[in-house]
């Protein structure tokens, strides 16, 4: 049994063992754990799973139960998994376990808000020579820099107004000497245009998880991972009910009412 009250029941926010025990009773993931055999995955929401290429398992397919549903009777589809993945990676949610999804293509740069990288990587104007230097540069916050400088906040996190100031006075940001002046100006301009647009970085990424149809989930990884089904046993890979979460707040809101008794909608063997 549990020895104390849980601190919460949101699979994307809690991190304790006590909470995880309850969450596993309220929710079910793609696969389940065998009761007596380690390393053996049993069907969960997914009835079948397999790599597209057996010799290079960097892309997986999970076929979902067509009769899967939430405790309120709503259909549970691949879209609920996609919503759950995006929510876990949403920077504003500040989940402790977001890194569990870093295996998925483009999960890490989105979660870390690597704006400069995402804005520039597919730009034909960025030469291989530019990328040779840029890929080594971290445009995120620098806690060792003076708090009054743009370096402390990081280029990726500057507001439109701050980026305008940087365009006018390039010396407000200390660049690595390896980054040419032309590259610097281009990066600042791209960041400024995006900051003005008020768009979400999600629109820039080529996220590896997709849903070809309601009952199929495809996951493209950064590298081959033969034991991906085992990883999906962790509750951070569980689906969450999109309709219930958004009824009580936005995707990145913490500690909303959706996990309260009477509101929580799960897909596990128990209900709250």
What are these model-predicted stretches?
Residues 21-25, 40, 44, 76, ...:
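Extracytoplasmic/secreted proteins, especially bacterial periplasmic and envelope-associated proteins
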Residues 3-6, 14, 35-36, 54, ...:
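Solvent-exposed coil/turn segments that connect beta secondary-structure elements
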Residues 48-180, 218:
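Aromatic- and charge-enriched surface segment that lines or borders ligand/interaction sites
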Residues 12-14, 63-75, 205-207, 258-260, ...:
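Second-shell loop/turn segments in exported
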Residues 34-36, 153, 160-207, 213-216, ...:
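Gly/Pro-rich hinge or "lid" segments in bacterial periplasmic/extracellular proteins
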Residues 1-55, 265, 270:
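N-terminal lobe/hinge region of extracytoplasmic solute-binding protein
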Residues 10-13, 74, 95-96, 229-234:
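Short, solvent-exposed loop/turn and secondary-structure capping segments
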Residues 26, 45, 56-60, 64, ...:
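Envelope-exposed proteins and targeting segments
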């Amino acid at each position: 049994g549990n020895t104390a009250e849980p601190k919460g029941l949101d699979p994307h926010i809690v991190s304790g063992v006590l909470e995880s025990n309850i969450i596993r009773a309220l929710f079910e993931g793609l696969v389940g754990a065998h009761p007596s055999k380690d390393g053996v995955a049993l069907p969960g929401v997914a009835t079948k799973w397999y790599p597209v290429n057996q010799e290079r398992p960097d892309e997986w397919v999970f076929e979902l139960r067509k009769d899967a549903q939430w405790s309120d009777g709503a259909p549970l589809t691949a879209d609920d998994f996609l919503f759950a993945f995006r929510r876990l990676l949403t920077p504003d949610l500040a989940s402790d376990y977001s890194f569990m999804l870093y295996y998925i293509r483009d999960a890490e740069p989105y979660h870390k808000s690597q704006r400069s990288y995402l804005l520039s990587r597919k730009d034909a104007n960025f030469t291989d020579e530019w990328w040779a230097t840029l890929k080594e540069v971290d445009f995120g916050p620098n806690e060792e820099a003076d708090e009054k400088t743009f370096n402390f906040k990081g280029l990726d996190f500057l507001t439109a107004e701050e980026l305008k100031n940087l365009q006018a006075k390039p010396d407000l940001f200390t660049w690595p000497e390896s980054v040419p002046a032309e590259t610097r100006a281009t990066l600042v301009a791209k960041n400024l245009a995006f900051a003005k647009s008020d768009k979400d970085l999600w629109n820039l990424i080529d996220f590896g998880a997709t849903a070809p149809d309601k009952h199929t989930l495809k996951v493209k990884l950064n590298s081959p991972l033969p034991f991906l089904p085992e990883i999906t046993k962790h509750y951070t890979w569980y689906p969450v009910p999109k309709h219930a979460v958004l009824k009580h707040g936005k995707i990145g809101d913490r500690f909303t009412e959706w996990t309260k008794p009477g509101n929580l909608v799960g897909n596990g063997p128990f209900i709250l």
